């Protein structure tokens, strides 16, 4: 999808809405160990019952220190999402990191994070969220190149390249189409002439959450 308007920072929003942010922070506080299925845990409709089970806020089982710890984690997470992770906008994504938006390293991180974001769901966002928070809790505001390398390494370890025969339209793994788009963007200067129409397309590419492989494939430059 082309960036038709450069006002990419206008009306940006957090990558996680508040109910999902609460659940992500709770999941991290619990050491990613829960009872039952993860799909049931990450359902906003179950928010109150989940907190009543894992972090009681009323009655005799209330632990004030646990609640205080959770609130501190919540503040850190929200700051991390505002500064160190992409924020969706009307035209694409913005990324702060206290750097100029023309910084090449920032662009690399933005594209990697946007690929991770669109290829995740409400039930798998915990992967990139915890990868991010590991770095933030270790370094505070991570170096942009260090954060990029860390996220990419964890992505590669989490999703190693499958065998060639598995990468076909007969499968239903949209992830690898997004990943291919990321690699094309990453190696664009090697693949396309700088003044070619193809380079213009790749330079302005924006990752989108598409619902079908048929929708994704034609977007690949």
Where are these regions (language model features)?
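Flexible coil/loop and intrinsically disordered segments
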Residues: 1-221
